[in-house]
Curated annotation (Swiss-Prot):
Organism: Bifidobacterium animalis subsp. lactis (strain AD011)
UniProt binding sites for Zn(2+): 143, 146, 156, 159
Subunit field text: Monomer.
Entry EC no(s): 6.1.1.10
Family: Belongs to the class-I aminoacyl-tRNA synthetase family. MetG type 1 subfamily.
Reaction(s) the record says it catalyses: tRNA(Met) + L-methionine + ATP = L-methionyl-tRNA(Met) + AMP + diphosphate
Localization: Cytoplasm
Source organism, top-level taxon: Bacteria
Protein name: Methionine--tRNA ligase
Broad class of the protein's primary localization: cytoplasm
Annotated gene: metG
Amino acid sequence: MSHIMVNVAWPYANGPRHIGHVAGFGVPSDVYARYQRMKGNDVLMVSGTDEHGTPILVEADKEGVTPQELANRYNRVIANDLCNLGLSYDLFTRTTTKNHEHVVQEMFRQCLANGYIYKGTQKVAISPSTGRTLPDRYIEGECPICHAQGARGDQCDNCGNELDPDELINPVSKINGETPIFEETEHYFLDLPALAEANLAWLKTRKGWRPNVLNFSIGLFKEVKPRAITRDIDWGIPVPVPGWIDNPNKRLYVWFDAVIGYLSASIEWARRSGDPEAWRAWWNDPATPGYYFMGKDNITFHSQIWPSEMLAYNGEGSKGGEPGELGRLDLPEQVVASEFMTMEGKKFSSSRGIVIYVKDILSRYPVDAVRYYISAAGPESSDSDFTWAEFVRQNNEVLAASWGNLVNRVANLIAKNFGQIPPIVEEKMTDEDRALLAQSSAAFDTVGALIEQHRQKSALNDAMSLVGDINKYISATEPWKIKDDPERLGTVLHVAAQAVSDANHLLAPFLPHSSQKVWEALGGEGTFSPLPHIEEVNDLDDPEFTYPVITGKYVLGENVHPWKSEPIVVGAPVVKPTPIFAKIPPEAVDEELARFDADLKARREAEQARLDAEKAKLAAGEE
């Protein structure tokens, strides 16, 4: 058994998550974690809501609530959505816990002690109308590198480069359209140039990465400069140095603290499990691989910023140093970044109304239909487009007509003719029977190898190819025509049921909810594919602060089945099954498109009204 770390990108708690988000970080990470558990490995899968930074402050101001109140609301919304999607976290927590604050401040102090954090000055954007610091991502302009319009003050989505707001050409505020002014202010900086050689050397040893991810990551080191890791803001983690720790208007930059969440969540999990040091098996052992799942817009922070923070903490940059009390931290084994998913040909944008939220699609359609679509048509290695027509087609033609119908056919024939799993009569076996069983057994190696390589689309295709071959076997053997040879009939149905069971094991990481139904349809008892649940907990260091976490029990041999062919149980009762998957009415496509158009129009009108109101306030102030 090996320890496997599965770190999942932290959704930002300024609104609900949409399908584009979970296509990048959610379903792929869960498929991988479930597979590794079935392989017998000890998986620790963590994440949480990212709750600091100026965007939450700005949104809270709009709504007339505190940042903590806004974060509390969306922490709960996001946790419920991801739990309902079946993402099997060992712990899904949040960044506003005292535990997270302590770990972040320990990281900062040791990086400072090792000489990789220093004090300097930087220009910051100020709103002329309010005098307040403007969030980097709320400033837009022309990218100075690729000259794309709409680049943000923290990053250009077109070329992927990190930016500072004062680097933008013709910058304007997204909040009210005014031109910001820039002032020098004191900040702490992470000395990325002093860490670049070690970071790049680590990158060049990476194997098995998606070429686009590795090439982009290496390209980040063509020109490396220090990055400010503090902000002029009153919402975030206090800066743990004298003269700053009590300053209400200086806080750590959200991206410095958010990536440390993987470590702090692991420590919180260990503390809640009753063994406070258990996390070290995943973080202080070089033999333990860590896999990070995200969308491609987060590559920079996971292949440059977070590794640099760990190298600085470890004392492994050009200035030397030594690790702090957390010990030497293991750098990522692999950054598994997906491309972007669009919606009906348009880029997902919550603010522009181009969106389908997780909670909305799950309220209307089965969860495994959503998971299947993301796995089969998601943006694994190239951009993909979510369309309602393709979503309905995948559900109806693949899940319902092929896989679901196969399970129902086999279970129905067994229930009708035997009422229980019949035995194999060796003398009645044919080469065709043996070939199918050999194929379904061998599929564990081929499908598993593809999941190991993070080629989940290919893995799913191979599993569904087996489903197609089982359907062909049923059609070729025609068990409904075997009237006078019960031993041959029983053998055929046993072979078919065993192959279906094997296919169900292969599909379990992708379709955990329906795999339980298939297991039961073939006479299986107990839990086949465990699901996560929500628990209400108290902050470990501030008992007055309560919040929901996603967690679960996933134990091989108890509620996790192995990644291999398990013999079905002869004599297990089988009754007439209910359909595993229901078809979606074709008219749902037009209904969803009409709903999308109506929502898009309403959101655009609301955003325009808000912007007009802001401009009116500015105009009134100038008169």
